[in-house]
UniProtKB/Swiss-Prot annotation:
Delta-conotoxins bind to site 6 of voltage-gated sodium channels (Nav) and inhibit the inactivation process. Impairs rapid channel inactivation of Nav1.4/SCN4A (Kd=500 nM). Interacts with a conserved hydrophobic triad (YFV) in the domain-4 voltage sensor of sodium channels. In vivo, injection of both native or synthetic peptide induces twitching of back limbs, running in circles, and spastic paralysis. Residues 23-51 form a propeptide. Its main location: secreted. It is found in: Secreted. This is Delta-conotoxin SVIE. The lineage of its organism: Eukaryota, Metazoa, Spiralia, Lophotrochozoa, Mollusca.
Amino acid sequence: MKLTCVMIVAVLFLTTWTFVTADDSRYGLKNLFPKARHEMKNPEASKLNKRDGCSSGGTFCGIHPGLCCSEFCFLWCITFID
C-alpha cells in the first residue's frame, strides 16, 4: 500500500514538473517565421553561420567534432595547414 502511494505521488510530481518546465508554444510559430524571413534576406544574420563556441587546433575536444572550428576531432582539435 505504501509503495503504491509513493508511486502515485512520484508520477504526479513528475507530470507536474513536465508541465511547469515546458516551453510556452502558443506563439512559437508566430515569432519563428519573421526571424527566418530576416535571415533569408540577410544570410550573414543567420546564427548557423557563426562559430562562437568553437575551439582552435590543439584543444581537447573528446569525441565531439562540433566543438572544433575545423570540424576534425580525434581527442584534440586538428587543424590542417595548406
